[in-house]
Amino acid sequence: MIREWQVLTTERMEPALNMAIDEALIGFVGRGEVAPTLRFYSWEPRGLSVGHFQRATKDIDRNRIEALGIPIVRRMTGGRAVLHADELTYSVILPEQMEGVPKTVIESYRMLTEGIRKGYHHLGIPVEFSVPMTEEEKEELRKPKSAVCFDAASYYELAVGKRKVAGSAQVRHQGVVLQHGSVPLSVDEGELFDCFLYEDETMRERMKARFAGKAVALNELAGRSVSFEEVRLAFVKGFEDALQLTFRPLEFNSTQWQEIERLAEKYRSEEWNWKR
């Protein structure tokens, strides 16, 4: 495995630009322009990302999110919707054929998520891998009851007890692995569930109550307010420990920024975000 990676931090960027950078990095890494990359980012304004195959018109209350000023963006990765507000988001981009990268999605997911797990441990939070054990848990993954990502933990996601602490997804494209994930520092459950369509308010309240037992934010686990920078530094250390890595900073050149801006237009478009 390549032991020297690059690290990139891009704070307070719009949703379309955040997704464009992740997609652009697939090309940059695939062409050998940059080394395998660990990226940390945040969102301004807050945004709602939906999974690549998710039916946004079926799940998302468009009128409500527009009234709240929450833009939507469709990810390259699968899974369900995530409201990105007070959080740290991470992404990892590396060649699929790089030595040491498992061939299966589940095992590579476990390898990369180990860096996040160790990062939580550096913050004093004993998170562990979640593996669905019961038939009920496995059925819940096959047929989700909710459009909300944090409603259930998949294989090798991170949890404290039965409560999910981070939501991640992975895709392989053009010979490159992209895994990105949301690490909420706090969650506004009222606003989160306002984003989705339900048959009635009773169902909305029922799903909100269910969510409280299925997910937990970092500040609640830490018992204090944890900053983006503190989490970022802990996760860098976590990846250094988990994969025996060193990091050097990544800065894009003007040509790379032009490619990112071109991709961002797709992520701002009605066609990409809603008509799929």
From Swiss-Prot:
Q: What is its EC number?
A: 2.3.1.181
A Pfam family hit: LplA-B_cat
Give the superkingdom in one word.
Bacteria
Top-level enzyme category: transferase
Active site (UniProt) = C149
Q: Does the keyword Nucleotide-binding apply?
A: no
Which CDD domains does the record match to this protein? LplA (cd16443)
Q: Which reaction does it catalyse?
A: octanoyl-[ACP] + L-lysyl-[protein] = N(6)-octanoyl-L-lysyl-[protein] + holo-[ACP] + H(+)
**Pathway terms, separated by semicolons:** Protein modification; protein lipoylation via endogenous pathway; protein N(6)-(lipoyl)lysine from octanoyl-[acyl-carrier-protein]
> What are the UniProt keywords, alphabetically?
Acyltransferase, Transferase
Q: Where is this site: Lowers pKa of active site Cys?
A: K164
The record's Gene Ontology biological-process terms are: lipoate biosynthetic process; protein modification process
SUPFAM superfamilies attached here? Class II aaRS and biotin synthetases
* Molecular-function GO terms, alphabetical: lipoyl(octanoyl) transferase activity
Name all BPL/LPL catalytic domain ranges. 32-247
Q: Where is the signal peptide?
A: none
Q: What else is known?
A: In the reaction, the free carboxyl group of octanoic acid is attached via an amide linkage to the epsilon-amino group of a specific lysine residue of lipoyl domains of lipoate-dependent enzymes. The reaction proceeds via an octanoyl-thioester enzyme intermediate.
The record's subunit annotation is: Monomer.
Q: Provide the family line.
A: Belongs to the octanoyltransferase LipM family.
**Its job:** Catalyzes the transfer of endogenously produced octanoic acid from octanoyl-acyl-carrier-protein onto the lipoyl domain of GcvH, an intermediate carrier during protein lipoylation.
The name under which this protein is listed is Octanoyltransferase LipM
Q: Which organism is it from?
A: Exiguobacterium sibiricum (strain DSM 17290 / CCUG 55495 / CIP 109462 / JCM 13490 / 255-15)
Per the record, the gene is: lipM
